[in-house]
């Protein structure tokens, strides 16, 4: 029951993060829900965990492919319907339904200048107005993003992590050459996939069907290989015993991971929302990047 108590409180902190600290991009709720499930497979062998992880990654990738394919059909139907109306022709009920589905998706996902200005005003006027604006995004996270996307995201990575732990990879017990190969191969694959995805996005002129990661069948493979590459890199740095001071500070940050994560939400709340300075939409990219090292320095030193 200790495991479930911890995950219960993680769930509570996640809900506080979403509804009090106004961060709808919270990961704690997703992690807690995944943790409830992982208890039942804690004694599985690494081989079985990897089989399950492969299945979950495949399901996630297939889901992304089907969603994008369906939306492309809907967009084509919308184009066909408009062309038919222009020519005074009738369209089938099926085409109309697909076209309507596309228009609803487009309205929900296409960002307009007026919409941005309304969001900035509501999020920077006061905490109350920011809270009211956040409610829809929070509901989308709880009732849509987590059950349909984020839960599977977290679960597949946690299962892979459990398998790597049982294979003595995460604890650095393998030879350094193993981790160098792991880092090199995984970064090569991961960066290749990510480069391809960026090319697709820019080449499409930021098409809304290309910018959404959950409409890319390569998404899970790219992030998986990048994660494995970072694991390999971190273990290599530990084994060569360099940057000892930085590693010690990062270890301390890791021990306070939950506190630091929630503090990011609190800091951002007071910097950007109406609860504090209300700087949302007022800072340039260069000014935003100056804030990042300041927060890092506070956490590390």
Residue spans for each PLM region:
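Internal alpha-helical transmembrane segments
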Residues: 1-74, 263, 268
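Hydrophobic alpha-helical transmembrane segments of multi-pass membrane proteins
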Residues: 20, 24, 144-155, 217-225, ...
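Kinked, hydrophobic transmembrane alpha-helices enriched for aromatic residues
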Residues: 9-21, 189-199, 252-278
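Alpha-helical transmembrane segments of multipass membrane proteins
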Residues: 13, 17, 59-64, 157, ...
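Specific transmembrane alpha-helix
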Residues: 27-40, 149-172, 222-241
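Solvent-exposed interhelical
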Residues: 39-51, 163-185
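Long hydrophobic alpha-helical segments that form multi-pass transmembrane helix bundles
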Residues: 55-151
């Amino acid at each position: 029951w200790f495991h479930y108590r911890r995950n219960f409180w993680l769930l509570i902190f996640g809900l506080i993060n979403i509804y009090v600290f106004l961060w709808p991009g919270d990961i704690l709720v997703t992690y807690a829900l995944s943790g409830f499930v992982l208890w039942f497979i804690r004694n599985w062998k690494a081989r079985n965990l990897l089989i399950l992880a492969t299945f979950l990654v495949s399901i996630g990738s297939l889901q992304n492919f089907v969603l994008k394919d369906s939306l492309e059909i809907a967009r084509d139907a919308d184009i066909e319907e408009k062309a038919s109306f222009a020519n005074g022709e009738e369209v089938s009920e099926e085409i109309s339904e697909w076209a309507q589905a596309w228009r609803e998706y487009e309205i929900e996902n296409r960002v307009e200048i007026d919409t941005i200005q309304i969001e900035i005003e509501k999020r920077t006027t006061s905490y109350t107005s920011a809270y009211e604006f956040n409610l829809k995004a929070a509901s989308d996270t709880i009732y849509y993003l987590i059950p349909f996307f984020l839960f599977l995201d977290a679960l597949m990575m946690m299962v892979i992590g459990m398998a790597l732990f049982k294979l003595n990879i995460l604890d650095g017990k393998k030879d350094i050459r193993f981790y160098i190969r792991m880092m090199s191969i995984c970064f090569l694959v991961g960066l290749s996939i990510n480069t391809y995805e960026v090319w697709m996005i820019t080449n499409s002129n930021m098409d809304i069907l290309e910018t959404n990661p959950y409409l890319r069948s390569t998404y899970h493979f790219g992030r998986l290989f990048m994660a494995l590459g970072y694991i390999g890199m971190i273990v290599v740095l530990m084994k060569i015993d360099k940057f000892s001071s930085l590693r010690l500070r990062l270890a301390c940050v890791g021990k306070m991971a939950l506190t630091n994560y929630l503090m990011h939400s609190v800091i951002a709340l007071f910097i950007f929302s109406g609860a504090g300075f209300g700087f949302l939409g007022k800072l340039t990219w260069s000014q935003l990047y100056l804030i990042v090292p300041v927060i890092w320095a506070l956490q590390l030193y």
